[in-house]
């Protein structure tokens, strides 16, 4: 019985007091019994956590009680056990580390496409379909005809753009990632560089898998997730794939 709710969320918003938010949030997680990881930075908040329905609703209400987080959107998936072993709240320079200054997805991100819009859009042969995730994620599964940037971590993505895409600023470029946060940054970064037509899959691969019937899906393989499930299939059920020997669970989190 899948009675554990796993929620992922993020929001790009200036948080001048982000350091002072750590202890209250961590205390509340312990109090409620929520497990997972939340990352705070000056640019916003990002996280994934899990619990039963009652615990999750209490924690949602707590987070949204801060007016800056009143509109937080939590993307839910479900499992029979909690994929996190403890509660963590981390302070970072970025909520997802790309290492490029002055990229602000809060106002300059690419055009959102719903799963249904995305499904049609990426079948256009003139669209450049780009996977923004890491090499080991791509190897587990990706969209049909997607380009692999062959990067070990997200910090390498800007260099990939400079080496391979800088002469394609007038092309339609569709980007995707697991839950959407990396695409917020990649599309904003590319718009800053002058790319004119950049699009992103709203709420990421997980939203597509939930929305598009498997019989029609353009997704091939499994989808890596950053918790103890390791990966999920097209039904969003956990699987235990054979990962490459150089796989490092914390690589994207550093």
From Swiss-Prot:
Keywords: Oxidoreductase, tRNA processing. Residues 123-217 form the Rhodanese domain. One of its GO terms (molecular function) is oxidoreductase activity, acting on paired donors, with incorporation or reduction of molecular oxygen. GO terms for biological process: tRNA modification. It is an enzyme of class 1 (oxidoreductase). The keyword Oxidoreductase applies. The active site is at 177 (cysteine persulfide intermediate). CDD domains: RHOD_YceA. It catalyses: uridine(34) in tRNA + AH2 + O2 = 5-hydroxyuridine(34) in tRNA + A + H2O. Its EC number is 1.14.-.-. PANTHER family: RHODANESE-LIKE DOMAIN-CONTAINING PROTEIN 7-RELATED, THIOSULFATE SULFURTRANSFERASE/RHODANESE-LIKE DOMAIN-CONTAINING PROTEIN 2. Catalyzes oxygen-dependent 5-hydroxyuridine (ho5U) modification at position 34 in tRNAs. HAMAP family: TrhO. Belongs to the TrhO family. This is tRNA uridine(34) hydroxylase. It comes from Legionella pneumophila (strain Corby).
């Amino acid at each position: 019985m899948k009675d554990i709710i796993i929620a992922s969320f993020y929001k790009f918003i200036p948080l001048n007091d982000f350091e002072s938010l750590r202890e209250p949030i961590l205390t509340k997680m312990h109090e409620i019994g929520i497990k997972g990881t939340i990352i705070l930075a000056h640019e916003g908040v990002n996280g994934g956590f899990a619990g039963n329905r009652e615990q999750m609703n209490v924690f949602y209400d707590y987070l949204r009680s801060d007016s800056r987080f009143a509109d937080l959107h939590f993307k839910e998936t479900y499992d029979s056990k909690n994929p996190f072993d403890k509660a963590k709240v981390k302070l970072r320079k970025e909520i997802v580390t790309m290492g490029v200054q002055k990229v602000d997805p809060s106002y300059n991100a690419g055009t959102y496409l719903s799963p249904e819009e995305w499904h049609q859009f990426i079948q256009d042969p003139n669209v450049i379909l780009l996977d923004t995730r890491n090499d080991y994620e791509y190897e587990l599964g990706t969209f049909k005809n997607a380009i692999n940037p062959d990067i070990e971590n997200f910090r390498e993505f800007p260099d990939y753009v400079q080496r391979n895409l800088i002469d394609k600023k007038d092309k339609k470029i569709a980007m995707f990632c697991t839950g959407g946060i990396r695409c917020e940054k990649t599309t904003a970064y590319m718009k800053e560089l002058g790319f004119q037509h950049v699009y992103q899959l709203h709420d990421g691969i997980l939203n597509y898998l939930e929305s598009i019937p498997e019989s029609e899906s353009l997704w091939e393989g499994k989808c890596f997730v950053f918790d103890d499930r390791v990966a999920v299939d097209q039904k969003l059920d956990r699987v235990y794939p054979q990962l490459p020997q150089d796989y490092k669970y914390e690589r994207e989190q550093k």
